[in-house]
Amino acid sequence: MVTVEEYRKAQRAEGPATVMAIGTATPTNCVDQSTYPDYYFRITNSEHKTDLKEKFKRMCEKSMIKKRYMHLTEEILKENPSMCEYMAPSLDARQDIVVVEVPKLGKEAAQKAIKEWGQPKSKITHLVFCTTSGVDMPGCDYQLTKLLGLRPSVKRLMMYQQGCFAGGTVLRLAKDLAENNKGARVLVVCSEITAVTFRGPNDTHLDSLVGQALFGDGAGAIIIGSDPIPGVERPLFELVSAAQTLLPDSHGAIDGHLREVGLTFHLLKDVPGLISKNIEKSLEEAFKPLGISDWNSLFWIAHPGGPAILDQVEIKLGLKPEKLKATRNVLSDYGNMSSACVLFILDEMRKASAKEGLGTTGEGLEWGVLFGFGPGLTVETVVLHSVAT
């Protein structure tokens, strides 16, 4: 008879969790940041608020964003005028959009990841789906299982209302699933659509206006498993460790509340300061076991909450400008897509590294860090090990 200990040992994988494929997707509707203030104030019937419009223009100019993708078109917004007001009851209209579009966008990203992975989708054993865009039962995990035609026995986990740190959270969870279930192949999907947060401007809620200048739509998907099959599965990054922490004195720094008016967004001015003040402690705890203390020796994947956060982190840690290149490129081309951002940055980094012949998936470097920041204020820290290209 097999003992519990022997059975448990047989369940565990031998090697570390490994990213084996990445896919991304956006809606087709592309928004030019330079013309967005005019469009936004026109579609929300707010053109008379000239001073506020000037403030919004400055926010968009400072955002370092060139373009974003949004499911919400002018046509959709005209059909749902309550979404264009500042605080009109509109949750039903928003929910009707996101319960369909969030899994649909997730499917696009997942199909790309599965295609790159090159294995039959029947080999997917676990599904982790994450979104801050609406809630429903059965959830997006169920909808995606149906849309992709995954096995009914796939083990699902649905994460709602996590916010911008969740790209790190899903990697942490997928790491544990892959390493503790021999042969597991975990499909991770983060899909975000701003239909829940879009609303008209108001003088008394400027942090909401910041969100209107930064947020975009996108979905990222990755396949994670341990012990890749040689010659069949191609590793991209290894997940070495993962940690989550709440920053001290940060209560109320980033909040979101689901109301009749949709998801309201609240942001304190000191968020960049709170993150930059505490980030080195997270780095030290993560990299001390590896004997690494030179932050410029790492490749960087940081959630691009906004340019102020990136600037302050760069200054605080003395990072060379090129360290946050991949992060800034994604912010510029897509905006802040909440949980999906870090998956886009992983994709950007491995593609740029291969194109430039840098030797590893991590810009030619061996070790890297992935950071997620969000409500709480919560920080996710994932230590990555690159793979030779």
Swiss-Prot record:
Report the pathway entry: Secondary metabolite biosynthesis; flavonoid biosynthesis
Please tell me in which tissues this protein is expressed: Major expressed member of the gene family in various floral tissues and in seedlings treated with UV light. It is relatively low expressed in tissue culture material.
Q: Which domain of life is it from?
A: Eukaryota
UniProt-listed InterPro entries:
Chalcone/stilbene_synt_C (IPR012328), Chalcone/stilbene_synt_N (IPR001099), Chalcone/stilbene_synthase_AS (IPR018088), Polyketide_synthase_type-III (IPR011141), Thiolase-like (IPR016039)
Q: Where is the active site?
A: C164
Keyword annotations of the record: Acyltransferase, Flavonoid biosynthesis, Transferase
Instruction: Spell out the reaction equation it catalyses.
Output: (E)-4-coumaroyl-CoA + 3 malonyl-CoA + 3 H(+) = 2',4,4',6'-tetrahydroxychalcone + 3 CO2 + 4 CoA
Q: Which Pfam families match?
A: Chal_sti_synt_C, Chal_sti_synt_N
Uppermost EC category: transferase
GO BP: any one term: flavonoid biosynthetic process
Q: What is its EC number?
A: 2.3.1.74
Molecular functions per Gene Ontology: naringenin-chalcone synthase activity
Q: Which PROSITE patterns is this protein grouped with? A: CHALCONE_SYNTH (PS00441)
What this chain does, per the entry, is described as: The primary product of this enzyme is 4,2',4',6'-tetrahydroxychalcone (also termed naringenin-chalcone or chalcone) which can under specific conditions spontaneously isomerize into naringenin.
**PANTHER family membership:** CHALCONE SYNTHASE 1 (PTHR11877:SF80), HYDROXYMETHYLGLUTARYL-COA SYNTHASE (PTHR11877)
Sequence similarity: Belongs to the thiolase-like superfamily. Chalcone/stilbene synthases family.
The protein here is known as Chalcone synthase A
The species this protein belongs to is Petunia hybrida (Petunia)
